[in-house]
């Protein structure tokens, strides 16, 4: 027997409600979030903060989180669905600014391990991005996003 997933119609209420989990985010008063996918990146960012208010596993759909003033650092489960859900929870909790730190290989010899690369465009093939921006194969970031970098 083949099963099908029933999708939500426009006039129906969504089953997934990020606001159910956003109270924790609101309690900390976060304005900015750094989302990482690896333990190494999480630890580097956490250690770079001047101070932090203890490591706490919060029910946000992430492996771990640390808060420092108005900034939160989160290690997401890997994959677009998990990171998108985490981001939706953070947005529902009032977070306005995001930086996502991933890891990828390079086909350019001049890019060495540990280099920081800021992508300015990408090709979309799958994942959750089609739920958030119009359908185009190639996406580019706004120039103001990287001014001064």
Q: Model-predicted segments: where are they?
A:
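Metabolite-binding pocket within alpha/beta catalytic cores that recognizes anionic/polar moieties
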Residues: 1-148
């Amino acid at each position: 027997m083949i099963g099908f997933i029933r999708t939500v119609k426009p006039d129906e209420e969504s089953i997934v409600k990020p606001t159910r989990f956003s109270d924790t985010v609101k309690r900390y008063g976060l304005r900015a979030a750094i989302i990482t996918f690896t333990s190494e990146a999480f630890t580097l960012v956490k250690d770079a903060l001047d101070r932090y208010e203890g490591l706490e596993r919060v029910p946000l759909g992430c492996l771990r989180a640390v808060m420092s003033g108005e900034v939160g650092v989160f290690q997401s489960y890997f994959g677009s669905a998990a990171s998108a859900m985490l981001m939706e929870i953070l947005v529902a909790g009032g977070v306005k600014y995001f930086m996502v730190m991933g890891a990828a290989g390079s086909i350019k010899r001049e890019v060495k391990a540990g280099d920081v690369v800021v992508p300015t465009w990408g090709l979309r093939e799958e994942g959750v991005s089609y739920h958030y921006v119009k359908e185009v194969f190639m996406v580019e970031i706004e120039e103001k996003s990287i001014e001064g970098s």
